[in-house]
């Protein structure tokens, strides 16, 4: 699949923009704070209905405006689709072929993207929240039911946490309601956990050989899911629910004392092992970056295996963060089969034939100039 054009209105520093793209490589060049990352973000938001940079949708709307809009034309193997996302203070509304979608979960997954930005290099050494977000965003693209369960889980979690804070003063009168929320949380949380196990099993199958290739056969990558309760992938749903229920009973008083939910998928984490050593703790910077790169390249292949089309790859200021060898491995892997967007302050020093016939887009203060580079 590839996006052939995009239109922006009142998005970040773009008042109005219409732009067409090549189906292979598009290089967006500009100094910092000129709008190149905003353009990249707009493509991501059009696909995912949320930003990878902020959870505050108001930041996506141009200063002093009431709404922002992103439109795009998506070309898939057997169809051409128009996508539209309208952002206002009231929230987001999505349209597919001019038809408004009742839920964003019906819209997400139509256009698949893989974002690789400098912050993704923190996937290994960053906080558990970074890794959970990685799971949620990638799983949501290929499993709409996961997004539904996640949204329901988050709603119940918010209600349960509010009740726990209330119970810090007087817990006895609210225990029945707490039990109701706990059972709802277990119901949705169990399904989330099962989907994460399945996804990571597939990701492991793709990421391990990719990592082996980048490390020239010297390293073996293993991905391990670390749930906040004592469950395993081999358990069936009823057993997982049972373990969750017992765990919630054991931490109930602590949760009331602290006013927050202490276990569940929102507290889980991932660990990465290279040659049986925890990369977060014992890995070199090079091993951590190889792991992050392997995961991103694995995402591309995993999405292809699920939807039978390659996703769109967004490389936001990340090439300069990789050494020449990893840079070449990345570009060799995607060459000719994945529509790719690259942002950079300069292409000087990036010698690769993938970029030789790229469409070059120069961004200066929210305006663009384009050229096809055939050098």
Curated annotation (Swiss-Prot):
Traced from the root, the source organism's taxonomic lineage reads: Bacteria, Bacillati, Bacillota, Bacilli, Bacillales
Alphabetical GO biological process terms: DNA replication; DNA synthesis involved in DNA repair; double-strand break repair; SOS response
Q: Does the keyword DNA-binding apply?
A: yes
Q: Which domain of life is it from?
A: Bacteria
Give a single Pfam family match: SMC_N
Q: What does this protein do?
A: The RecF protein is involved in DNA metabolism; it is required for DNA replication and normal SOS inducibility. RecF binds preferentially to single-stranded, linear DNA. It also seems to bind ATP.
* Protein's UniProt name: DNA replication and repair protein RecF
Q: Where does ATP bind?
A: 30-37
Organism for this UniProt entry: Bacillus anthracis
Under the heading InterPro entries, the entry gives: DNA-binding_RecF, DNA-binding_RecF_CS, P-loop_NTPase, RecF/RecN/SMC_N, RecF_2
Any one Gene Ontology cellular component term annotated for this protein: cytoplasm
- Subcellular location(s) of the protein: Cytoplasm
Alphabetized Gene3D superfamilies for the sequence: P-loop containing nucleotide triphosphate hydrolases, RecF/RecN/SMC, N-terminal domain
Write the record's keywords in alphabetical order, separated by commas. ATP-binding, Cytoplasm, DNA damage, DNA repair, DNA replication, DNA-binding, Nucleotide-binding, SOS response
> Main localization of the protein?
cytoplasm
Indicate the family of this protein. Answer: Belongs to the RecF family.
One GO molecular-function annotation for this sequence? ATP binding
């Amino acid at each position: 699949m590839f996006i052939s054009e995009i239109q922006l209105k009142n998005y970040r520093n773009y008042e109005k923009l219409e732009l067409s793209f090549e189906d292979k490589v598009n290089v967006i060049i500009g100094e910092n704070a000129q709008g190149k990352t905003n353009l990249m973000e707009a493509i991501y938001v059009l696909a995912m209905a949320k930003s990878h940079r902020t959870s505050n949708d108001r930041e996506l709307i141009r200063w002093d405006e009431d709404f922002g809009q992103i439109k795009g034309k998506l070309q898939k193997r057997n169809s051409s689709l128009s996508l539209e996302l309208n952002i206002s203070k009231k929230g987001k509304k999505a349209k597919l072929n001019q038809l408004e979608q009742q839920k964003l979960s019906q819209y997400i997954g139509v256009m698949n993207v893989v974002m690789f930005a400098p912050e993704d290099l923190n996937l290994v050494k960053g906080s558990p929240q970074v890794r959970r977000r990685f799971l949620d965003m990638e799983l949501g693209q290929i499993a709409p039911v996961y997004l539904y369960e996640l949204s329901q889980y988050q709603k119940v979690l918010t209600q349960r946490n509010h009740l726990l804070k209330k119970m810090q003063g007087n817990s006895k009168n609210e225990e029945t309601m707490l039990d109701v929320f706990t059972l709802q949380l277990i119901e949705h949380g169990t399904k989330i956990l099962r989907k994460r196990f399945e996804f990571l099993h597939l990701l492991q199958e793709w990421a391990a050989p990719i990592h082996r290739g980048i490390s020239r056969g010297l390293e073996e990558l293993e991905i391990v899911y670390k749930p906040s309760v004592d469950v395993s992938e081999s358990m069936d749903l009823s057993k997982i629910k049972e373990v969750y229920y017992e765990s919630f009973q054991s931490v109930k008083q602590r949760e009331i004392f602290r006013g927050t939910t202490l276990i569940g998928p929102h507290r889980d984490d991932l660990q990465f092992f290279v040659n049986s050593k925890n990369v977060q703790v014992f890995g070199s910077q090079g091993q951590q970056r190889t792991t992050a790169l392997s995961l991103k390249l694995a995402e591309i292949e995993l999405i292809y295996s699920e939807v039978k089309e390659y996703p769109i790859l967004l490389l936001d200021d990340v090439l300069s963060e990789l050494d020449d060898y990893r840079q070449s491995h990345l570009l060799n892997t995607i060459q000719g089969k994945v529509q790719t967007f690259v942002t950079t302050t300069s292409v000087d020093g990036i010698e690769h034939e993938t970029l030789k016939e790229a469409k070059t887009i120069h961004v200066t203060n929210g305006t663009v100039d384009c050229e096809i580079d055939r050098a």
